[in-house]
């Protein structure tokens, strides 16, 4: 990739930039925007949880609750976008493969109308392997947390 083709590193990302950074698309895109990115150290992503989310049809009818695994996915996507942005590449050139989830805790349900703030903080990185601590918060209250491991690789790498 030439210098002219390297996307600018930004300290936040609207939905258009998120779509450039990540290969995920509806219905699996779990981040609407990123309001803060600090190098490869930390980021805060936003997920506006609406009643129109497809997972609410079955989880649970009459009492919709965002599945915990999708809160973890939102954390992984926020961390992935942070790493891709830091490296100055795009989701079309690199993929972030989710490798591990440790110490996952779900403390409160996330429901339609909530704004999920996804905080990720780097624990360590070695080469292409990255580890982050993630926290999900609604109205400033912790709703979920975990540690995430991921590997970054070029498209087509297995």
UniProtKB/Swiss-Prot annotation:
> One GO CC term of this entry?
membrane
EC top class, as a word: lyase
Any Gene Ontology biological process: lipid A biosynthetic process
* Enzyme Commission number(s): 4.2.1.59
Q: List the active site.
A: 59
Q: Does the keyword Lyase apply?
A: yes
**What does the UniProt entry say about where the protein is found?**
Cytoplasm
Keywords per UniProt? Cytoplasm, Lipid A biosynthesis, Lipid biosynthesis, Lipid metabolism, Lyase
Chief localization: cytoplasm
Name the domain of life this protein comes from.
Bacteria
GO molecular-function term, one example from the UniProt record: (3R)-hydroxyacyl-[acyl-carrier-protein] dehydratase activity
* The UniProt record lists the keyword Transport: no
Catalytic activity from the UniProt record: a (3R)-hydroxyacyl-[ACP] = a (2E)-enoyl-[ACP] + H2O
A Pfam family this protein belongs to? FabA
- Which family is this sequence assigned to? Belongs to the thioester dehydratase family. FabZ subfamily.
Looking up PANTHER family in the UniProt record yields: 3-HYDROXYACYL-[ACYL-CARRIER-PROTEIN] DEHYDRATASE (PTHR30272:SF1)
Task performed by this protein: Involved in unsaturated fatty acids biosynthesis. Catalyzes the dehydration of short chain beta-hydroxyacyl-ACPs and long chain saturated and unsaturated beta-hydroxyacyl-ACPs.
Name used for this protein in its record: 3-hydroxyacyl-[acyl-carrier-protein] dehydratase FabZ
